[in-house]
Swiss-Prot record:
Binding site for Zn(2+): C510, C513, H526, C530
Protein name according to UniProt: Optineurin
Localisation: Cytoplasm; Cytoplasm, Perinuclear region; Golgi apparatus; Golgi apparatus, trans-Golgi network
Keywords on record: Coiled coil, Cytoplasm, Cytoplasmic vesicle, Endosome, Golgi apparatus, Metal-binding, Zinc, Zinc-finger
Source organism superkingdom: Eukaryota
């Protein structure tokens, strides 16, 4: 349809005798440029969609890695807590054996200390249960992500009994079933909203993880305090046991307890190091989050630009449809006019046949009258006949001219309507291009002003740096000479007064403090220092 629009006016103009080839060439160029721009916009949209898909996949992979690391860290903490609990139980058993050896002297004190140790053990076990509960809450909150967050964590806990034992902890750890599930990317039109929701949920999960890490640090600090208290109590208990008869056995138990306490301290230090590593990983996740936010901002800008381009495309499609409808209407009008011309041709054929009949009859009548009338009348009739033929020829010529003018007018009407439609399209394109060029020109002017301002500032800074460097070089070069001249100033002035007859010697003096200087460079440096 577009090729018909572009070629049809050209043919009509050639029929009418007018040559509008440059105008048609410009229209062809503009249409080709518009088609190229539309293709470029479609390619850019496809590229943006591919980049969005790649970004989504990268985010999914990074989230899966972070969740795996977090779960591994939780499992390590649980195992460390179990080891600590076992060591505390072994310490308790050793203390109980040592208490049985010294039960003869201090049964009441040992019973009270045993009760305290039992209470502390129950507290530690309760704290361990709280830690396991926190871990389960963490995994529940991580599992509460929807399909848009690309990760789903499900787990089932088996807990029974009042105090958490090793077997129950192992069951809980074995029953944590982590399943990762990636979400399918939505269609091209509506891919921005789930990504924003996923990013916001990721930010929330990162905040919750940082808060939980802080809680774990506090709990580790409290556990360290309790371990210190246990160490103090064991040391006190050892001091009391020294007074008993079994000094050798108690000394051995003290050595064992101190070694075990050192081992516990080392394990606590390792746990602190692991916490620091988790904090570093969280910082890396925050940096990755910031980079993702920047990328999302860039993608939003690109989407806005694509929306503007899509609106322009829709307007172009609307104009193309409008032109197609106009072409169809003009084709229907052309068909009607062709039918009219065929009917007129049929009428002309009928008139021509009748004219031929009349002419033949006229010739026969003329021959008969010639035979009848005289020569004078014959001549008069011939003259009249010539006049009538001339009049008929004139009328026929005028009729032909009127027909040609009518056909030309009809063709001119068609060309005028097509040209008007093209002029409307070209005007719309011209206004759009002019507005775009004005915007580009304004942006160029703003960038040029900024560039000139930055160049001026750069030149100023460069001049200042060059001046400072030259002054520093001069100061380094003539620093020693200025000090010597300051000490020998009066002597040089007196000598200059004595030798006024020597015109070749030039004396450089400061106008403020009357200090004589051997060089102009040192004088400039001294004047700058003296004025400041």
């Amino acid at each position: 349809m577009e090729n018909e629009l572009l070629n049809h006016p050209h043919n009509n103009n050639m029929v009418n005798g007018h040559q509008d080839a440059p105008y048609d060439a410009l229209s062809m160029k503009n249409d080709a440029e518009m088609l190229e721009q539309i293709k470029q916009l479609l390619m850019e949209n496809n590229n943006l969609k591919e980049t969005m898909k790649q970004m989504n996949q990268e985010m999914k992979e990074r989230l899966e890695e972070l969740l795996k690391r977090h779960n591994q860290h939780l499992l390590d903490l649980n195992s460390a807590n179990e080891v600590l609990r076992k060591e505390l139980q072994s310490l308790k058993e050793k203390i109980a054996t040592s208490n049985q050896g010294s039960a003869v002297c201090s049964t009441s004190e040992e019973a009270s200390e045993n009760k305290q140790l039992k209470n502390q053990l129950t507290r530690l076990q309760a704290e361990k249960a709280d830690l396991l509960g926190l871990i389960s809450e963490l995994q529940l909150k991580l599992g509460s992500f929807s399909e848009d967050s690309f990760v789903e964590i499900g787990f089932s806990e088996r807990e029974s009994g009042e105090i958490v034992n090793e077997e129950k902890a192992n069951k809980i750890l074995s029953d944590h079933n982590i399943s990762y599930r990636t979400n399918s990317i939505k269609e091209e039109g509506g891919g921005t909203e789930p990504e924003e929701v996923a990013i916001s949920r990721l930010l929330r999960s990162l905040r919750e993880e940082t808060q939980k890490v802080e809680r774990l640090e506090k709990e580790l600090f409290s556990a360290n305090k309790r371990l210190a208290e246990l160490e103090k109590q064991t040391s006190e208990f050892c001091d009391k046991g020294v007074q008993t008869e079994q000094e050798s056995e108690q000394s051995q138990s003290e050595v064992i307890i101190s070694s075990e306490v050192d081992i516990l301290k080392e394990k606590v230090k390792s746990l602190n190091k692991e916490l620091q590593e988790t904090n570093d990983k969280l910082n890396e996740a925050k940096q990755f989050k910031n980079s993702l936010q920047e990328k999302c901002i860039l993608l939003d800008k690109r989407l806005q630009e694509n929306q503007v381009d899509l609106e322009e495309k829709q307007s172009l499609r609307y104009s193309i449809k409008k032109l197609e409808l106009q072409v169809e209407s003009q084709e229907s009008e052309i068909k009607l006019e062709q039918n009219k011309t065929e009917a007129e041709k049929n009428q002309l054929g009928i008139l021509q046949v009748s004219y031929d009949k009349l002419n033949s009859e006229y010739q026969e009548l003329r021959i008969r009258e010639i035979e009848k009338v005289s020569k004078v009348e014959f001549n008069e009739l011939l003259e009249k006949l010539d006049v009538c033929e001339k009049a008929l020829a004139k009328k026929q010529f005028e009729i032909d001219e009127m027909r040609e003018m009518d056909t030309k007018h009809e063709e001119d009407k068609e060309t005028i309507e097509l040209l008007r439609a093209q002029v409307d399209v070209y005007c719309a394109d011209f206004h759009a291009e002019r507005s775009a060029r004005e915007n580009i020109h304004q942006e160029k002017e703003q960038l040029a002003t900024r560039l000139a301002y930055m160049i001026q500032e750069y030149e100023k800074l460069k001049e200042e740096m060059m001046g400072k460097q030259s002054i520093e070089q001069l100061q380094r070069r003539h620093g020693a000479t200025s000090l010597l001249d300051a000490s020998e100033g009066p002597y040089l002035v007196a000598r200059g007064a004595a030798n006024m007859e020597q015109p070749s010697i030039t004396v450089y003096t400061c106008p403020k403090c009357n200090l004589t200087v051997p060089d102009m460079d040192t004088l400039q440096i001294h004047v700058m220092d003296c004025i400041t």
